[in-house]
Design a protein with these regions (language model features):
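N-terminal pre-P-loop "Q-motif" helix
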Residues: 1-18
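Pre-Walker A (Motif I) flank of P-loop NTPase domains
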Residues: 16-22, 47, 108
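Walker A/P-loop
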Residues: 17-37
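Conserved Walker A/P-loop ATP-binding site and its immediately adjacent core
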Residues: 31-36, 42-68, 169
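Conserved helix-turn-beta segment of the N-terminal RecA-like "Helicase ATP-binding" lobe
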Residues: 57-91
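Conserved two-lobed SF2 helicase motor
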Residues: 102-120
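SF2 helicase catalytic motif II
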Residues: 114-117, 122-160, 165-170
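A short helix-turn-beta junction within AAA+ P-loop NTPase domains corresponding to the substrate/partner-engaging
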Residues: 173-174
Length: 174
């Protein structure tokens, strides 16, 4: 996969830093940076990665984008929308899905929304990496507990929080 120079710099920095923000204008390739980072982690060993989106439709779109490139992964959606992938909002089912993946040494990729992120928290599963797309949505009061939990949890690379911001104002500066 060929990355543009600014995307390669982002990936290099992500490999060096456990937490950070990627601020790139709309259409600048933030999703490709997430996918490239996730792909590297999956090659390195078993991982559970969570992708958080503000809306169900965006979670589904991100899932489609990831799965065009990453195919050796078990996928789950944690939101109330319909999807062709396994989907639940029940913490026990999330935990069972994780345990099954762990038993068989499978990488796991979970797509969720800010509204449902607390269900993953309640499941108690360890998360290696979490990507917050449109992270400005995470500051809403009823999302804050779950986002803070994942930002401060010390599971292997769970603390490697990548905050992805889509800032339309930056388009004017570019």
């Amino acid at each position: 996969m060929n990355l543009r120079p600014h995307q390669q710099r982002i990936i290099n920095k992500m490999n060096q830093t456990p937490k950070g923000q990627v601020i790139v204008p709309t259409g600048g390739g933030k999703t490709m940076c997430m996918i490239t980072d996730a792909q590297r982690q999956f090659v390195e060993g078993y991982n559970t990665i969570v992708v958080v989106a503000p809306r169900i439709l965006l979670a589904q779109q991100l899932s489609n984008d990831f799965l065009k490139i990453i195919d050796n992964v078990k996928v789950m959606h944690v939101h109330s929308g319909e999807t062709k992938h396994y989907s639940t909002t029940k913490p026990n089912d999330i935990g069972n899905w994780f345990c099954k993946n762990q038993l068989f040494g499978e990488n796991g990729l979970i797509f969720t929304t800010y509204h449902s992120l607390h269900k993953i928290q309640q499941s108690g599963i360890p998360v290696n990496t979490i990507y917050f797309d449109e992270a400005h949505n995470s500051v809403q009061q009823h999302f804050h507990t779950a986002t803070r939990f994942f930002a401060t949890t010390n599971n292997r690379r769970c603390s490697s929080l990548l905050l992805l911001l889509i800032i339309a104002i930056m388009m004017k500066e570019v």
